[in-house]
Amino acid sequence: MPSTPRQFVLPDLFPLVPFKGSTNPHYVKAAAESSAWINSYNVFTDRKRAFFIQGSNELLVSHTYPYAGYEQFRTCCDFVNLLFVVDEVSDEQNGKDARHTGNVYLKAMRDPEWNDGSVLAKMTKEFRARLLQYAGPGCYARFLKHCEDYVEAVAKEAEYRECGVVLDMASFETLRRENSAIRLCFGLFEYCLGVDLPEYVFEDPTFMTLYWAAADMVCWSNDVYSYNMEQAKGIGGNNIVTVLMQAKGIDVQAACDAVGEHCKLLMERYLDAKEKLPSWGPSVDDAVAGYVQAMEHWIIGNLEWSFETQRYFGAVHAEVKATRVVMLRPREIDED
């Protein structure tokens, strides 16, 4: 019987991505304000607070929205921190409770008058007010739809986790596109850029090929980087590495290699679709070009952030970036 591997090598994704990363000049001031905002609600246990600080959410926002103005950047920081709260709470809930948590967020996003008195509702309402200062009607309508899909997907994820179900590839990919919240993060592009794209852009098959290739690239790379942390926490079922291992009957290294190959295909698909984008006239084309560049910032920014934070690789994140070797962590015992 083969022994359980003690380590695996990450795929080298940086050479696949021909984009230049950058960071936001407003990071230091806005990050401190957003951290203070989230900490003022006392939503974390000591252990969760340490994980929150270690995760460097605002640093992710700096890498992925480097072009955003101060107000927009601060709002994006607040949103990613708010998502962290929703995600961390629902990760430890059953399907029914995760759905309730998601619905609190969703109702507070939809209706400025709704309030159940919870901390999550108050935080969400404050984020909503910031968002609506600059979001156009199309942008906000799409964002709300993504919120609905996200809440539904997170509840389903919790139900599958409760039952110990690992999905097949096709079902997982559909779920992952929604429960990753990447569509919500992409939904902030128009807000940051000060544009409101016509709906017909999002109905164009070439644009959506580009969109899904970018979204999947973020999801797949995130999963391979977060796999070790998630399997140690006992929540590895919602990860493409686990899905590939089960679907193909392969070990962790073969699954990571498969992720690398798929990311190569995704980037080829993205670059091909980018060349084939139609024209909708100068003003729309300019707005679309900004949106496309924003997707590219997310792709490269997510890769760079993953090795600057301790969230996935702890204190050895720089060493892991250099060697790509990850030592498998033992299962954690939750002390909370």
From Swiss-Prot:
- Name the positions where (2E,6E)-farnesyl diphosphate binds: 311-312
In terms of superkingdom, the source organism counts as Eukaryota
User: Motif DDXXD motif residues?
Assistant: 87-91
Disulphide connectivity of cysteines: none
Q: Which UniProt keywords apply?
A: Lyase, Magnesium, Metal-binding
Detail which positions bind Mg(2+) 2.
Answer: 87
**GO biological process terms on file:** isoprenoid biosynthetic process
Q: What is this protein called?
A: Sesquiterpene synthase 10
